[in-house]
Amino acid sequence: MKTSPHRNTSAIVDLKAIRNNIEKFKKHINPNAEIWPAVKADAYGHGSVEVSKAVSDLVGGFCVSNLDEAIELRNHLVTKPILVLSGIVPEDVDIAAALNISLTAPSLEWLKLVVQEEAELSDLKIHIGVDSGMGRIGIRDVEEANQMIELADKYAINFEGIFTHFATADMADETKFKNQQARFNKIMAGLSRQPKFIHSTNTAAALWHKEQVQAIERLGISMYGLNPSGKTLELPFEIEPALSLVSELTHIKKIAAGETVGYGATYETSEETWIGTVPIGYADGWTRQMQGFKVLVDGKFCEIVGRVCMDQMMIKLDKSYPLGTKVTLIGRDKANEITTTDVADWRGTINYEVLCLLSDRIKRIYK
C-alpha cells in the first residue's frame, strides 16, 4: 500500500515533541544508561526512518521488531546500533551480521540452528532473551543461558547482551513485576560471564520503577507522548503527544428528519440535520467502533453518525461549514482536545493499538 499524497487526511508528527520527551526521560532515568528507542511498527505509526534520524544524536541505539525493519533503517543511512527484539529465521543471520544488526537469541535450539549455517559468525551480535514471566520468547533458566554463552564463544559469536521484558510494569499492583524482577536477577547472578548490555527497562519500568539500574533503557510509547498505563497511573513528569490526526470536510448537506445515514441505516435523524463527510475510514485504521464517538470541527465536538465506511465517515454538524474545513480526530482544536487514549477507551483497547493501526494511506507530515 502506498501513501495517498493527494488525499486530505494527514497525521501530523511533531519531531521536536519526541526529542523533548526523550530529553525529559534522560533527566529522570539512570544517567549512565543509554536510551534505545523502540521504533518498531513504523515507530508506532509515527515513521521509523524520520523519527530515528530526528533523535539519533540523543540515543545509543534503536530497537525494532524484525529484520526487515532494521534493514529499512540501514538502507536510509541510520548508523546507530540496532537490536531486533523478535526472533528471526536462522538462515538470515548473515544479513544481520553484515549490516551490524544485533539479534535476539530466544533459545539454545535457535542458536544451534544458527551455528549450522554456512555463514561468517564472527560479526554476529546476540542478546539472549529471558522469559521471566511474559510467556512470549526467551530462555527460562540459567543453565540454558550458560550453554548458549558457551556455544556463542565456540563460534566467535559476540554475546553482546541479555534482556527480559516486564508484563505488568504499568500496573498499580507490583507483585508480578517484582516476581519477574527476581527471576531475571537470579539468572543474571548465575551467568558464567556478563555481557556488555543487561537490560529489562521498558517505558513503564523507566517511569515507575527507577530502582532498575540498566545499561539500556528501551523507551517506547512515552517517547511519543503517551502514558503506557492509559489513565491507570499518573506520569511522574509531563510529556507531549507527538501525533495529531486531521482531515477535512469533503461534502456537506442538510437532510430531513427521518432520513438515515450509512450502511445498515443505523442512524436516523430526528430533525433537519447538517451532515458532513470526512475522508477517513476503517481501511485507514479508523475502525467501525468509532460510530458514536466525537471529532472536533471549529473547536466543537461533533458526533460520528452511521457506520464508519471503508474510506469515509459521516459526522453531525451544528451548522453548514465550507468545504475544506478542518476536522480533528486526534489532537487539540481551540479549547477542546481528543487524545489517543480517549479513542482507545472508546474502542476498549490501548493507545498503542490506535497509533499502530493508522495505515500507510494516511500521509505523515513532519514538523
Swiss-Prot record:
Binding site for substrate: R136, M310
Isomerase as UniProt keyword: yes
Cofactor: pyridoxal 5'-phosphate
InterPro entries: Ala_racemase, Ala_racemase/Decarboxylase_C, Ala_racemase_C, Ala_racemase_N, Ala_racemase_pyridoxalP-BS, PLP-binding_barrel
One of the protein's GO biological processes: D-alanine biosynthetic process
CDD domains xref list: PLPDE_III_AR
Any one GO cellular component localisation term in the record: cytosol
Pathway: Amino-acid biosynthesis; D-alanine biosynthesis; D-alanine from L-alanine: step 1/1
Keywords of the record: Isomerase, Pyridoxal phosphate
Record-listed E.C. numbers: 5.1.1.1
Pfam families membership: Ala_racemase_C, Ala_racemase_N
Catalytic activity: L-alanine = D-alanine
Active site: K40, Y263
GO molecular function, one term: pyridoxal phosphate binding
Top-level lineage group: Bacteria
Modified residue annotations for N6-(pyridoxal phosphate)lysine: K40
Family affiliation: Belongs to the alanine racemase family.
Chain's role: Catalyzes the interconversion of L-alanine and D-alanine. May also act on other amino acids.
NCBIfam families: alr
Protein name, UniProt field: Alanine racemase
Origin organism lineage: Bacteria, Bacillati, Bacillota, Bacilli, Lactobacillales
